[in-house]
UniProtKB/Swiss-Prot annotation:
Organism the protein comes from: Saccharomyces cerevisiae (strain ATCC 204508 / S288c)
Topological category with respect to the lipid bilayer: Single-pass membrane protein
Parts of the chain that traverse the membrane: 102-118
Keywords, sorted A to Z: Membrane, Transmembrane, Transmembrane helix
Name of the molecule in the record: Putative uncharacterized protein YGR265W
Leftover remarks: Partially overlaps MES1.
Main location: membrane
Compartments where found: Membrane
Amino acid sequence: MTYLRIALASNKRKGSFVLRNSMAALSLSTSGFKFLLAYSSARAIFKLFANCKWAGCFFDLSKEMRKDMLVVNFRFFFKFYSSTKMHIRKQIIINIRHRRKFVIVFFFFSFSLSISCVQKFFLPPKSFVPRDIEKK
């Protein structure tokens, strides 16, 4: 079962989004692996959500936001539930001004991660020997 959780509250006065806590977490869980994206820079994320057009693009910022050199600390936690219980932690610091590069890197990284998950869970291991060869 896949679920998304965003710790955001609605601000009716300005029509923007405000962080409820100092850390907002977006977690995506599937049967094979868990993906947790945590934002540790609450001030920068507050400015990001307060000025973005939610109905349009997530990274569509206003002109004032483009002038600011905001650095958001994105921490990626990848946890694979396998026999080895491998834990991978990646930390990426991204400038909002180069958000297109972030989107490209994020989709490339998620694509490579999905390929590795397919290889891990759906393909036979290297030590796999078919039954026909075992009989001979």
